[in-house]
A protein has these predicted regions:
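Conserved alpha/beta-hydrolase "nucleophile elbow" surrounding the catalytic nucleophile
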Residues: 55, 127-132, 224
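Alpha/beta-hydrolase fold nucleophile elbow
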Residues: 118-129
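The serine-hydrolase catalytic nucleophile loop
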Residues: 58-70, 85, 233
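Conserved alpha/beta-hydrolase
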Residues: 70-92
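Catalytic nucleophile-loop/oxyanion-hole region of alpha/beta-hydrolase
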Residues: 61-62, 88-118
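Short beta-strand element of the alpha/beta-hydrolase
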Residues: 46-56
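The alpha/beta-hydrolase serine catalytic core
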Residues: 31, 133, 138-140, 148-237, ...
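N-terminal cap/lid segment of alpha/beta-hydrolase-fold proteins
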Residues: 18-44
Length: 277
């Protein structure tokens, strides 16, 4: 019995020692984030724009292309916050409980946090893959619901995966097959990642372009020419949604992960946010 008590105490101490101090929380709990500031930046006296970076499904703030984009933005004097959505990697929550609406709530919580930073002059949003859907809909919510503590000055979408709605409606998502009208408690993608019934049903009902279209500021959309996961029509439909405010840049030879020409992608993103600062 004494041995069991000691083991329990050690376990609890371990949890306490490695507990994370989350500054922002979403529907599933604390959100792990990384703030990157320009070199030599003094938060007491300086000010700069900031871009919130949103990763794709199953991905992380520390996976390509986010760290390189953050570094390139900093070189141009632009701060960034990249974070793990709820249920992903270092953030709290479960992947199986994740939905796109919950990720929008995460993004809005991060928006509110960025607005509270006194040295931030204006804010941009960037999203990759599912994060692109989240970023576009978040921008629309900000525009339509009056979240205007700081100006939203630009939106960058990297291979925005609006095809997820079609996939869930067709009952075929990545390598998972299911009845779209009555999906199981969860499906397993790539033999590891669980997506829950709530995700599979709610994604079918998203008004992606209708929500996104409320934002009328500048938009840059970047899509890899060799993207085999998200078809080009997704980006083309976003261009139709935003009209003349949007431009689509196709990076020839680039894949969906943006891992072959990451520097070029980071430079295109940075040039966009620097131009509109």
């Amino acid at each position: 019995m004494k041995r069991i008590v000691i083991l329990l105490i050690v376990a609890l101490l371990g949890q306490w020692m490695y507990a994370k101090d989350y500054q922002v929380s979403g529907p599933q709990g604390g959100l792990a984030m990384t703030l990157t500031l320009p070199d030599g930046f003094d938060i007491a006296t300086d000010s700069c724009p900031l871009v919130i970076l949103m990763h794709g499904i199953f991905s992380s703030k520390n996976f390509t292309p986010m760290p390189k984009i953050a570094k390139q933005l900093a070189k141009a004097g632009i701060a960034s916050i990249r974070f793990d959505f709820g249920g992903h990697w270092s953030s709290e929550g479960e992947m199986q409980l994740m939905t796109i609406e919950k990720e929008i709530a995460d993004a809005l919580a991060m928006w509110d946090y960025a607005c509270s930073l006194p040295y931030v002059s204006k804010i941009g949003l960037l999203g990759h893959s599912q994060g692109g859907v989240v970023a576009s809909m978040t921008a629309g919510r900000i525009a339509s619901q009056g979240h205007t503590a700081k100006p939203l000055y630009g939106l960058a979408l990297l291979a925005p995966a609006s095809v997820l709605k079609n996939a869930c409606r067709n009952g075929s998502l990545f390598d998972a097959k299911f009845d779209p009208a009555d999906p199981p408690e969860y499906v397993r993608c790539f033999k590891m990642m669980k997506l829950g019934r709530e995700y599979l049903l709610s994604t079918q009902q998203l008004d992606i372009y209708g929500t996104a279209g409320a934002y009328q500021g500048p938009v840059r959309i970047i899509h890899g020419g060799n993207d085999r996961l998200v078809p080009m029509w997704c980006s083309e439909d976003f261009v139709k949604t935003y009209g003349e405010a949007a431009e689509l840049i196709v990076v020839e030879g680039e894949n969906h992960r943006l891992s072959k020409k990451t520097r070029k992608v980071a430079e295109l993103v940075t040039a966009f946010f620097d131009t509109h600062r």
